[in-house]
Amino acid sequence: MSTPKIMFYHDGRHPLIYRYEPPMQPEEYEQGVDELLGTPVEAIMFCLGDGRTVLHDTEVGELWGHNRKKWPHLIFRRAHQNASGLIRKGHDPLRMICDRAHQYGKLVYPTLLLQQGRGSWDEDVRCSDFRFENPQLEIGARGDLPEGYPGSTCLDFKHREVRDERFELIAETLRKYPVDGFELQMNYQPYYFHPDEIDAGRQIMTDWIRKVHRALKRSGRKRELAIRIPSSIEGCYEVGMDIKAWLKEGLVDVLIGQTFSGPELLDSTVDFSPLV
């Protein structure tokens, strides 16, 4: 398959697994691909789930809702029931998307929401045990950030445990599934280091991106690394992402800009010219 020119982000949740009453059938899940047939879309950027937890048959990560018996919202419970039900019957959701897309000549780039914060146990039912059990790995762990700082409960990438946990989920996906590339959504909540440690953090993040890129290319030479970032190069630099260094070293194959946000905010009028 040739390098795609039109790539479509499929959330996998709101337009798919949230919409069907359990038990979801394989044919229903395949609608994630079928609804794009007849369109010029060449590659599907398919979201792996919440990011802290996922909606496929992972062995190194955590399945969405595996740690829950009570749910504050029907939709979140439905996602767990549908994903776990498909997996129990031998239908891995991510593999189904890959196989269906390839059947019709479309590429698949799984999308990992790399970063987001953590809420309370009672309400944040999509969160992983890893997050709940390791608050010391969060950016605000020292307790010295202003009240309301948006990245205080996000993971601090200065910690090797954080980088390893994120990387292992990516590596498993590259190893286990017939994907054509991988997307890091780094603009979902773009906070990766304590504000006082951004300068040191840039090199840490560049080293980690290099590790991901190498793993991807070793798993398949033609596989591409796509990275979604805030559209401001300066804004990225200020939160620890040295985009110019990544590009100079050839660590990124596809660069996707969005409005600086947390979580996502789409603005079709934003100036993307700095990325060109």
List the predicted regions and their residue ranges.
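Solvent-exposed loop/turn segments at secondary-structure junctions
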Residues: 12-16, 50-53, 114-118, 188-191, ...
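Short, solvent-exposed loop/turn and secondary-structure capping segments
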Residues: 19-20, 55-60, 113, 119-125, ...
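Active-site neighborhood of glycoside hydrolase catalytic domains
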Residues: 161-276
